[in-house]
Amino acid sequence: MYVSVAVMDTGIFRHMDFDTRIAGFADFVGRKKYLYDDNGHGTHVAGIIAGSGKGSNGKYRGIAPDTFLVSVKVLDKSGNNLCYPLKWYIWHLR
């Protein structure tokens, strides 16, 4: 069974702790098609959730290290947010 968590934040940088477990990406700020994080906060949150510990030789792991991530960029580099992505997410839960 696979579990995915949507990280609705500033985006996610590729990182050795979860790079192979990024299941999707949507950018509602810059409309870019590639994975990025222009602030770093979203990547930090992703590590807390799903970090495998690979980058720290097992010293630092997330609370669910086998979880897949879906990066939903809803915050710009200054942390400002948008309402539309939340409506999109709720619509797709149906």
Question: Where are the predicted features?
Answer:
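Cationic, amphipathic, low-complexity alpha-helical segments enriched
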Residues: 82, 86-94
